[in-house]
From Swiss-Prot:
Belongs to the TRAFAC class translation factor GTPase superfamily. Classic translation factor GTPase family. LepA subfamily. Residues 7-191 form the tr-type G domain. GTP binds at residues 19-24, 138-141. It is an enzyme of class 3 (hydrolase). One of its GO terms (biological process) is positive regulation of translation. This is Elongation factor 4. PANTHER family: TRANSLATION FACTOR GUF1 HOMOLOG, CHLOROPLASTIC (PTHR43512:SF4), TRANSLATION FACTOR GUF1-RELATED (PTHR43512). It comes from Rhodopseudomonas palustris (strain TIE-1). The gene is lepA. NCBIfam families: lepA, small_GTP. SUPFAM superfamilies: EF-G C-terminal domain-like (SSF54980), P-loop containing nucleoside triphosphate hydrolases (SSF52540).
Amino acid sequence: MTTAPIDNIRNFSIVAHIDHGKSTLADRLIQITGGMSDREMAGKEQVLDSMDIERERGITIKAQTVRLKYRAHDGKDYIFNLMDTPGHVDFAYEVSRSLAACEGSLLVVDASQGVEAQTLANVYHALDAGHEIVPVLNKVDLPAAEPEKIKQQIEDVIGLDASDAVMISAKTGLGVPDVLEAIVTRLPPPKGDRDATLKALLVDSWYDVYLGVVVLVRVVDGVLKKGQRIRMMGTGAAYDVERVGYFTPKMVNVEELGPGEVGFITAAIKEVADTRVGDTITDDKKPVTDMLPGFKPAIPVVFCGLFPVDADDFETLRAAMGKLRLNDASFSFEMETSAALGFGFRCGFLGLLHLEIIQERLSREFDLDLIATAPSVIYKMKLTDGTEMEIHNPVDMPDVVKIAEIEEPWIEATILTPDEYLGSVLKLCQDRRGNQKELTYVGARAMVKYDLPLNEVVFDFYDRLKSVSKGYASFDYHLTDYKPADLVKMQILVNAEPVDALSMLVHRTRAEGRGRAMVEKMKELIPPHMFQIPIQAAIGGKVIARETVRALRKDVTAKCYGGDITRKRKLLEKQKEGKKKMRQFGKVDIPQEAFIAALKVDS
């Protein structure tokens, strides 16, 4: 098949909040245009969500792409390249790179729920990328749907004219053909010059067991052919193209891709790390001089230690992480050791959902039992000798005497919540040291903007927000800057030994509450030993909270009948000596669940 005329190509992505039905709409578009037969679609929902976890949680994690053929009402044949994007804030970089490869977006909004915080964030990404946007109202067949009200809401909140929004129900297929026509008439074709030197954008890459690294590309100028020698401008590496093709979602091989087309190439690339997302691909013999504007690389924001419960699983864990890293360049890890937990890894994630998903994939796909330490963020330390350092593990914090100032990262959070939960949401943000920036109303819902320290958000903010708003509030954030903070390092001591896995940086005002809650939890879960065990929370040398696990005690005087009190006293003294000795040399076993519970404590 020859490459299509550029005016008949439409590249678009679907932008929506979680659960507003974008993967289902993608299924319908594939079905109507014949990308997969009805037999292949049967029993399969969310064709583009290939990971089990994606289907189960109903979220899209990796951006996927599919090419569809469509004969429009004007009798011409069009080629659509649909880029499915994730909706969740942690995967914003997946969204930004899908959008960079398109000219237009379908904005899908649930007609019963309206605009959510992450819809907003993704729409702004699309507007920044210079997209034409077609609003689509989904689930209009539901009894709770209020299309007119939602249209008005789209205009008020986003500022888009939604009067001619397409009304659909992706589940039943109602109105979906109108979406295809809107794509043809309302979205622009790509621009590009077929005769110019090859210039293509590297949109994504992943590892395939048979083909090696598969690279998803969007050709901007020139032609990408099989057998051509290409160069990655960012890394300077050159490769020979082995195969060229596109997805329908099945892989189809072709001879070449022309300007405006989206497809994949494979070359003998060994690791995904060799391909930088957002890089420019060009011809090795006559390279272009200017690179395409890429997108910001994904920077890890949240860090935590992952340790195998069984020390023998360490190598399995290392191999498993290497495999996940093949497909997820934003996940980083390095080895670390902990006195309490043994060998493990310090990992960097884009956010809490990312952390949860990696953890779940490790335990599910590789059958590993893991302990995660408390999540932390990157702090900047200014030292008294004038140097600066960044730390993301509280254990590495230098001596307090050497620190002149600690700075922590802040975020701007946008929260949309129904009016009746506004009070609880505001209280939650205040408790987390937030500063309110603005509060506006969109119909019956409030939109609040808050500045919050990221440290307070990574722990369990999202869960708390969902629980105080009965699941109705939605939340999106972006990093703003670093600000000085009064942070202290809190350690948990068990039998006077610090447990490094539980040490954390907390704000001075919250240290006592946090410390007390943690020691109380630990007291419940550490089983009694033959000697009493003090559990303390301390800042520096000062203990701020303490609980004691009582000792198990044998009745040594049981076999003395009557007789002299000094005999009993001698036995009791002897027992006391033994206990004292035990306490000096005894080792306390801290069970697994005590760690996990202590880390989940909410102060």
